[in-house]
C-alpha cells in the first residue's frame, strides 16, 4: 500500500504494499519464473535496492498505469479507482511490451516524486497493518484526488478549523446520535454540541491531551473512530463515525494537524520527526482479562483492558465512556515490573494464565484465558517497563489518580 523507497523507514514513506520491481524480484526469488521480458528490464537496478527493509505481503499484483507493485489487499482498492489505476496479476496475467517498459521506467522514486511531493508532516501514512479505511483513503488521496501534488486540496484538514456532524455514541444509552463537532486550533480544543443551535458545548476536549485512533471492530462500523481526552485526570472515551470514509479520515488528520501545531509551540526546538510520533497513538494492547481487587481476596471478574502508552485502563464494557480504574505503569528503575504467573496464595477461580504487575504501591493480579493472550500482554507490559520514563511522565505519575 505504501509508496516509498525500498531502503527507507516508515516515517520517510516506506513501502508497506507497493514495491519497485527490482526489489520485488530480489526479495521474492519465487517470482524469478516470470517471463524474462518482465523481470529482465530492471535487472541492472537491483543492486541499488535494499529489499531487507521491505514490509508487508508478497506483491503479486501491479498497477500498470501507475508503475507500482501492490499486495492482494491493496489491489482491491486500486481496482475501485479504474480511471486512475489498472491492475494486473504479476503471476497470472499477460503483459504487453509497452506495459513492461512502463513498469521498468517507473518505480517508487518516480511515483513518489509525482504523487507524494507535498505530504504534510502530520498526515497519517498507514502501514500494511492499519485498517481498510486508512489504507483506502491514503491510496485515493494520492492517486485519485492527488492531494499531495496539489496542496490546495488539503484544506479540509489543514485549515486549523473544522465543523461538521458525526454520529456519536451516547455515554449512557449506547445509541449513536448525530452531534455537531467543532475543531478550532485557535482555542486548542475539539468541542461537541448536543443540538446544532446550542450556544454552549456539551464537552470541550483540549488538544493537549487528545488522542484519536480508528477502532472499526470495537465500534462496529468500518469508519469508527475512538477519541480520548483527559477529564479530571481520568480518561474519557468518545466513539464516533461518519458514513463517508473521506470525511472521517479528514477529521482524523485535522486532529493530528491541530496536535502538530500545538506541539510545535510547546516544543519549539523539536524537529518534525520528533513530533510526528506524538500526534496520535494506537493502543499497545487491548482485550479481556480477569482481575481481582486490592485485597486480592475478592473474586476475579472479567474486564476489558486497554494499554494506552503508560495507562492501563479497565472497563466493564469495551465501549464504556469512563474506565472503572486506571493504573500508571512506570519504568523498571522506578520500581515497576511485570511477572509471569500469580502468587501461590491467590484465591478464587480465575483463568489459567496469570500476570502480576508490581508497582511501588501494590500488586495487580490479572489472568488471561489463553497462553497466546498472556504472551501478548506480557510483551506489551515489558516494553513499557523497559522504557525509561520521560520528565513529563514523572509529573503524570505524581498526579495519577488510581481507581481500584
Predicted regions and their residues:
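Eukaryotic cytoplasmic intrinsically disordered
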Residues: 127-159, 217, 239-276
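Canonical RING-type zinc finger of E3 ubiquitin-protein ligases
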Residues: 56-66
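Tryptophan (W) side chains
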Residues: 2, 19-21, 28
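Canonical pleckstrin homology
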Residues: 173-179, 212-262, 296-302, 338-398, ...
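Short cysteine-rich clusters marking metal-coordination/redox-active sites
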Residues: 51-54, 71
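Cys/His-rich, Zn2+-coordinating zinc-finger modules
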Residues: 34, 38-47, 72-155
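Structured beta-rich ligand-binding regulatory domains in large eukaryotic signaling proteins
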Residues: 77-78, 83, 181-216, 235, ...
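Disordered regulatory linkers adjacent to lipid/PI-binding modules
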Residues: 159-161, 260-322, 328-329, 333-352, ...
Amino acid at each position: 500500500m505504501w509508496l516509498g523507497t525500498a531502503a527507507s523507514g516508515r516515517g520517510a514513506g516506506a513501502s508497506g504494499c507497493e514495491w519497485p520491481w527490482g526489489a520485488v524480484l530480489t526479495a521474492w526469488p519465487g517470482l524469478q519464473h516470470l517471463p524474462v521480458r518482465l523481470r529482465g528490464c530492471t535487472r541492472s537496478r537491483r543492486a541499488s535496492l535494499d529489499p531487507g527493509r521491505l514490509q508487508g505481503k508478497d506483491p503479486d499484483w501491479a498497477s500498470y498505469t501507475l508503475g507500482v507493485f501492490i499486495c492482494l489487499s491493496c489491489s482491491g482498492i486500486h481496482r475501485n479507482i479504474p480511471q486512475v489505476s489498472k491492475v494486473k496479476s504479476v503471476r497470472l496475467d499477460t503483459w504487453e511490451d509497452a506495459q513492461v517498459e512502463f513498469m521498468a521506467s517507473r518505480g517508487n522514486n518516480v511515483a513518489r516524486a509525482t504523487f507524494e511531493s507535498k505530504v504534510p508532516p502530520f498526515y497519517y501514512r498507514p502501514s500494511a497493518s492499519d485498517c481498510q479505511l486508512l489504507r483506502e483513503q491514503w491510496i485515493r488521496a494520492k492517486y485519485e484526488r492527488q492531494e499531495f501534488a496539489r496542496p490546495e486540496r488539503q484544506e479540509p484538514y489543514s485549515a486549523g478549523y473544522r465543523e461538521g456532524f458525526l454520529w456519536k455514541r451516547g455515554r449512557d444509552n449506547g445509541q449513536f446520535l448525530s452531534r455537531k463537532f467543532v475543531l478550532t486550533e485557535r482555542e486548542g480544543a475539539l468541542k461537541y454540541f448536543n443540538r446544532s443551535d446550542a450556544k454552549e458545548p456539551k464537552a470541550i476536549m483540549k488538544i493537549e491531551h487528545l488522542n484519536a485512533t480508528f477502532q472499526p471492530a470495537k465500534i462496529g462500523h468500518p469508519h469508527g473512530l475512538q477519541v480520548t481526552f483527559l477529564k479530571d485526570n481520568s480518561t474519557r472515551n468518545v466513539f464516533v463515525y461518519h458514513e463517508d470514509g473521506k470525511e472521517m479520515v479528514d477529521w482524523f488528520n485535522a486532529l493530528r494537524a491541530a496536535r502538530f501545531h500545538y506541539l510545535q509551540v510547546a516544543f519549539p526546538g523539536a524537529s518534525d520527526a520528533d513530533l510526528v510520533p506524538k500526534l496520535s497513538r494506537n493502543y499497545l494492547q487491548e482485550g479481556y482479562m480477569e482481575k481481582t481487587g486490592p485485597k486480592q481476596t475478592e473474586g476475579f471478574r472479567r474486564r476489558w483492558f486497554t494499554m494506552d502508552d503508560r495507562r492501563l485502563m479497565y472497563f466493564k464494557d469495551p465501549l464504556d465512556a469512563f474506565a472503572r480504574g486506571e493504573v500508571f505503569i512506570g519504568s523498571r528503575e522506578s520500581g515497576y515490573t511485570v511477572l509471569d504467573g500469580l502468587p501461590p496464595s491467590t484465591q478464587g477461580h480465575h483463568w489459567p494464565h496469570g500476570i502480576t504487575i508490581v508497582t511501588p504501591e501494590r500488586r495487580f493480579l490479572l489472568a488471561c484465558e489463553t497462553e497466546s493472550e498472556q504472551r501478548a500482554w506480557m510483551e506489551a507490559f515489558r516494553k513499557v517497563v523497559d522504557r525509561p520514563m520521560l520528565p513529563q511522565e514523572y509529573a503524570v505519575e505524581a498526579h495519577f489518580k488510581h481507581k481500584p
